[in-house]
Regions:
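Extended, loop-rich substrate-binding clefts of extracytoplasmic carbohydrate-active enzymes
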Residues: 14, 88-143
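Acidic/His-leaning functional-site neighborhoods
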Residues: 27, 96-110, 218-290
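Active-site/ligand-binding surface loops and adjacent short beta/alpha elements
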Residues: 2-8, 170-255
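Acidic, contiguous internal or C-terminal segments within carbohydrate-active enzymes
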Residues: 123-174
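Short Pro-Gly-centered flexible turn/kink motifs
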Residues: 78-87, 151, 296-313
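Acidic-aromatic substrate-binding/catalytic surfaces of carbohydrate-active enzymes
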Residues: 28-84, 89-91
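Short, Gly/Pro- and small/polar-rich lid/capping loops
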Residues: 1-25
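Beta-strand-rich interaction surfaces with strong enrichment in secreted/lumenal proteins
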Residues: 136-138, 292-297
Length: 323
């Protein structure tokens, strides 16, 4: 593939496409063309997301953008205006369509600077999806070392389109094993699923091992659960924090559109016994069928949502401290 010649780039394109390296103070991020994914984010030399190489497809969907739906569509089928739509099956083991239509899409670079990059991915009409959309994502490093991610969906059709979005970051604190970290998610409820991982009912977290409201150790739990009923802070944002015993932490924040957080622990990331994904979602699994959390995007309209990461790394200098 050919990289945009008038834009700086980092590394070879390889499997993940164009590499964009952002830096600000002691913070750095690498954003790639494939799936508009966040390949690495670290502050003061401490990795706060699970990194992977430029020459591999994102393992376990690490860091990808998910649109026009996150998680699964049951049986890869949904109903639009009384007509069954049949999506391509992308999770053969269960027969579902998983994580939207951008996982294998190479995003085009729209703007690129030292601090920020905006990428554009196109969703064309295809099996089970009759709409044309544009999905833009902007990653921007802030002066305090935080990372802000803005996703925008644009409707190019004359129809109202049901959409939902999400992201799939795996969080970490340097080399601390995942089992030794603590996670806080201010969620009052969890979504019970069947063996096919499709939602069955929403239940309170009270008295369960899924109550992360005051924080609890990740431990050896086999987590794969969607949490909801999120309590916002005074500024209206939802915040989930991963914390190490030495005080280092990373907080994932979202705006009000992200009413769901999917917590997923896997042993499928190379070099890690286990890894923890904390996925911000605007809708849960199978939203195209249930309607839960779906945004109805008006003809030719745009919809923008935002989330980000805040580092808590002792002795991390802010950009203004360097002035």
């Amino acid at each position: 593939m050919t990289e945009t010649s008038d834009l700086p780039a980092f590394g070879a394109p390889d499997a993940t496409g164009t590499q964009h390296r952002l830096h600000r103070g002691s913070a750095e991020a690498v954003v790639v063309g494939l799936a508009g994914a966040l390949r690495r984010y670290r502050v003061a030399g401490v990795d706060l997301t699970e990194p992977y190489g430029p020459d591999v497809v994102p393992p376990a969907a690490n860091g990808i953008q998910m649109s026009p739906w996150p998680n699964r569509v049951a049986g890869a089928r949904w109903i639009l205006d009384g007509v069954e739509q049949r999506l391509d099956v992308t999770e053969p083991a269960r027969g579902h369509a998983s994580h939207g239509l951008l996982r294998n899409t190479h995003f085009v670079t729209e703007t690129f600077s030292a601090h920020a990059v905006t990428l554009r991915g196109e969703i064309h009409p295809q099996h089970g999806w009759p709409f044309r959309l544009t999905h833009r994502v902007t990653y921007e490093l802030e002066a305090d070392g935080g990372l802000t991610v803005t996703a925008e969906v644009q409707n190019h059709t004359d129809a109202t389109v049901p959409v939902a979005v999400g992201a799939h970051p795996f969080l970490r604190i340097g080399d601390v094993p995942t089992a030794e970290l603590s996670l806080r998610v201010p969620a009052d409820a969890w979504i019970r699923t069947g063996e096919d991982l499709i939602p069955v009912e929403t239940l309170p977290v009270d008295g369960t091992e899924l109550d992360f409201r005051r924080g609890r150790a990740v431990g050896e739990a086999a987590l794969d659960v969607c949490l909801t009923g999120l309590t916002p802070d005074a500024d209206g944002r939802h915040r989930q924090t991963l914390l190490a015993a030495d005080g280092r932490a990373v907080t994932l924040w979202t705006d009000h559109a992200f009413a769901y957080t999917h917590v997923f622990v896997t042993d499928r990331l190379p070099g890690r016994d286990t890894a923890l994904a904390v996925e911000p979602l605007t809708a849960p699994a199978d939203a195209l069928n249930s309607g839960e959390g779906l945004h109805r995007l008006a003809p030719h309209a745009r919809w923008s949502v935002q989330w980000g990461l805040t580092p808590h790394v002792p002795d991390h200098p802010h950009e203004e401290d360097r002035a």
